[in-house]
Amino acid sequence: YQTSTFMFETVEQGGARFAGTETGYVYSRPANPSTNAVEDKIASLENGEAAMATASGMGAITAMLYCSVVAGDEIVADETLYGCTFAFLSKEITQLGVKVSFINMNNIDALKAALTDKTKVVYFETPCNPTMKVIDIRAVADAVHAFNKDIKVIVDNTFCSPYLQRPLDLGADVVVHSATKYINGHGDVIAGFVVGKPE
């Protein structure tokens, strides 16, 4: 559906949709049948309950992190990250009073030492961009959830894609993607996805 708006059968139907008392499409920014179809496919590929499409991979990453933390919270992230993600975590989100610690996520002792009662998110990519370092998702998720099951383990699965790796099946809580890379495969689309578990 290459449209920004949708028709209604009646004025009353339009009013009900805008009021939120009837489900259906109103405007393509919040929902579009084509976007919903892609979201459903990505969620299925990742064994997730639902997915949200974004305008870019960084849109997916920042949306997920912004809704997961507030001032005073802490994020523990791997030290090897895509440059824009590292810049966001080290320079942008910290301006909102969020503390970010960077560690080698393969060092489980360092991970355990970095976790505090203020930690809300553990974030990493695997394989990492650009070094292709591989991180043991299950080992990280098990260590984090043993400390506090409410901490979100967020994995950027851009470089593996769900064809080779499904982080939710390995204990992660949320998966993010830059669809520009392997999901699209051609470098001619800019998009991102956030995929979550049933809970």
Tell what function each PLM region has.
Residues 9-10, 126:
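A broad "ordered helical/assembly scaffold" signature
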